[in-house]
Amino acid sequence: MRYLPLTPEDRADMLGVIGAETIDALFVDVPAVAYRKDPVDLPFHAGELEVEREMLALSRRNRSASEGPFFVGAGAYRHHVPATVDHIIQRSEFLTSYTPYQPEIAQGTLQVLFEFQTQVAALTGMEVANASLYDGSTATAEAVMMATRVTRRGKAVLSGGVHPHYVGTVETLAHAAGVATERLKAAIDAEDAVIAAIDADTACVVVQTPNVFGTATDVSKIAAAAQAAGALLIVVTTEAVSYGLLKSPGEMGADIVVAEGQSIGNGLNFGGPYVGLFACKEKYVRQAPGRLCGETVDADGRRGFVLTLSTREQHIRRDKATSNICTNSGLCALAFSIHMSLLGEKGLRQLALVNHHKAVKLRDALAAVPGVEVLTPRFFNEFAIKVPGNAAELVETLAANGVIGGVPFSRLDPGAGLDNVLLVAATETTPDSDIALFSKALSKVLAPKGSNQ
């Protein structure tokens, strides 16, 4: 079929119907500084081969996480993903953007979502989980919005241990929704400050464990304080593998649990897509965002799966919707579920133990470097260290020596005044030889000038 563009007469008729004189009148709301009327001066188009060469040249400027010692975490973690995961998710039945509106032709997809929800509920220690959200940060923002609906209050208290990017996402959505946010000062252990900030206007308290500094915390006291004030406790986790070793948020009294599920079944990538985990107490389920898959029986009594709750604007009136989450995280949720099924309960615990043991080895190696101070007392697979001078400059120097040595906290929160704090992580993909190389490189970089190190 040929593409037949609109004629000048067609455009004139359409503008006449809406009462506009010119096409430019349609863009009066766009600020003049952002509205470009002249054509963009782009280079002449290239062929497929030339474009491929150009993209390869650009990609060579990047450095893969597998190209050398790599200790980056801070919310996204390098883990081994079995080849089985990618093989299964590429089946045509799964590799689709189709939303399972019609259960009679989507039982496979619906069963996978049901199993995913079951796994997430078990991991988080909660009663019910939804069928995934975009990622951990947007799941956190959705949880805050949900808490304001449940409590009919308008303020969220955000712990100083919550990842700054998550805080930024919450603040963006909260501002648009008219919800006040109280962001506490960044702190390795923020329990006392969080409890002190709770008042009669607080809809929810948002805490993270392990937090952005790696601190693994029992949030039971915060849960008791929040609930005594009529607020909900939202617990955030950025490293889902930690569920295999640490006490679940549900056991500690959480009302809502959100997490980034990238660590299980999904590789590192810049910009996503990742998969947000969302679970809550059953009494709040009708205020939960996204979709929820349920089990039922058909007319012949056979077991089947359907979308039980879909409080999103594609399914119900926009003013009644609690979220506009769509299907883009479904494939990532499937990858999560496949990897979890391959691991099993014992496998996940073993994986978590390996991660912790690797981090302990890293902690011991770095603590022996003169000038380095380990700041995180209790951790899973990530911790913070204090270094002499500027951590961002140190990371650049380490990179020049072949080691990607973590994330400077100042890169996450430039205004926190923690320019000498470096976040480092180790997983099952970190060989002992890389830990030794990191320790050696750090000793060399921090050694006084003129020394023999």
UniProtKB/Swiss-Prot annotation:
EC assignment: the record states: 1.4.4.2
Which SUPFAM superfamilies does the UniProt record give?
PLP-dependent transferases
A GO BP entry is: nucleoside metabolic process
- A molecular function GO annotation: glycine dehydrogenase (decarboxylating) activity
* Catalytic reactions on record: N(6)-[(R)-lipoyl]-L-lysyl-[glycine-cleavage complex H protein] + glycine + H(+) = N(6)-[(R)-S(8)-aminomethyldihydrolipoyl]-L-lysyl-[glycine-cleavage complex H protein] + CO2
Pfam families given in the database record: GDC-P
Q: InterPro entries, alphabetically?
A: GcvPA, GDC-P_N, PyrdxlP-dep_Trfase, PyrdxlP-dep_Trfase_major, PyrdxlP-dep_Trfase_small
Question: Residues of the signal sequence?
Answer: none
Q: By its UniProt entry, which NCBIfam families does this protein fall under?
A: PRK00451.1
Sum up the protein's function in the record's words: The glycine cleavage system catalyzes the degradation of glycine. The P protein binds the alpha-amino group of glycine through its pyridoxal phosphate cofactor; CO(2) is released and the remaining methylamine moiety is then transferred to the lipoamide cofactor of the H protein.
HAMAP family per record: GcvPA
| Protein name per its UniProtKB record | Probable glycine dehydrogenase (decarboxylating) subunit 1
Task: Please spell out the taxonomic lineage of the organism that makes this protein.
Answer: Bacteria, Pseudomonadati, Pseudomonadota, Alphaproteobacteria, Caulobacterales
